[in-house]
């Protein structure tokens, strides 16, 4: 670290603590904001402060929101009878960007009694007919799906999970065996 530049070093360290930012990139960012474009630096600081102050989880689904209910839960045009369970609010951002789903969400970041009770209340209140699991594929997520299916089997729900298999453009030799196995076992007719 540069001697006598404590504030610069602190900024570099703050950037380097962010995911996917290494020390060289952190130095470039700090230099750009302090020397090359101080207006961008001030704007970034303001935007970070506002995001931290105003973004919170949606009361209903757990998505990122600036209000009690997020835009998705408030949207009258969305399918209100389908609920997609995800692990993180980031997953909602990804699914929304894909424009492949028009229902509601529920962030299941922890599997505990409080979350399960909240999920049950939403299922009943909104008269959900289908529960879609969009979880990272693993033995733990399979166990979670099985547990939730069993817990809510009396609610007359259709349970489904997102398809999995081989990504586009990937050679078979580069696919892990679990994904290849699932792709073969859950193949679709053409």
Swiss-Prot record:
Zn finger (C4-type) location: 58-73
Cross-referenced Pfam families: RecR_HhH, RecR_ZnF, Toprim_4
Gene Ontology terms: biological process: DNA recombination; DNA repair
Taxonomy, superkingdom: Bacteria
Ranges annotated as spanning the membrane: none
Keyword Zinc: yes
Signal peptide annotation: none
InterPro entries hit by this protein: DNA_Rcmb_RecR (IPR000093), Rcmb_RecR (IPR023627), Rcmb_RecR_Znf (IPR015967), TOPRIM_dom (IPR006171), TOPRIM_RecR (IPR034137)
PANTHER family: RECOMBINATION PROTEIN RECR (PTHR30446:SF0)
Family: Belongs to the RecR family.
Protein name: Recombination protein RecR
Species of provenance: Campylobacter jejuni subsp. doylei (strain ATCC BAA-1458 / RM4099 / 269.97)
The organism's taxonomic lineage, starting at the top: Bacteria, Pseudomonadati, Campylobacterota, Epsilonproteobacteria, Campylobacterales
């Amino acid at each position: 670290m540069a001697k006598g530049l404590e504030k610069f070093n602190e900024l570099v360290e703050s950037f380097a603590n962010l995911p996917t930012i290494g020390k060289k990139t952190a130095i470039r960012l700090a230099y750009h904001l302090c020397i090359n474009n101080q207006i961008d630096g001030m704007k970034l600081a303001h935007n970070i402060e506002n995001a931290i102050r105003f973004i919170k989880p949606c009361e209903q689904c757990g998505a990122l929101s600036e209000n009690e209910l997020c835009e998705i839960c408030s949207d009258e045009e969305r399918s209100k009878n389908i609920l997609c369970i995800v692990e993180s609010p980031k997953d909602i951002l990804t699914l929304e960007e894909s424009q492949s789903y028009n229902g509601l969400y529920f962030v299941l970041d922890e599997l505990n009694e409080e979350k399960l009770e909240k999920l049950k209340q939403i299922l009943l209140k909104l008269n959900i007919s289908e529960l879609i699991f969009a979880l990272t594929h693993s033995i733990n997520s399979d166990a979670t799906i099985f547990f939730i299916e069993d817990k809510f089997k009396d609610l007359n729900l259709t349970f489904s999970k997102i398809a999995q298999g081989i990504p586009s453009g990937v050679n078979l030799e580069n696919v892990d065996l679990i994904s290849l196995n699932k792709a073969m076992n859950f193949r679709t007719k053409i």
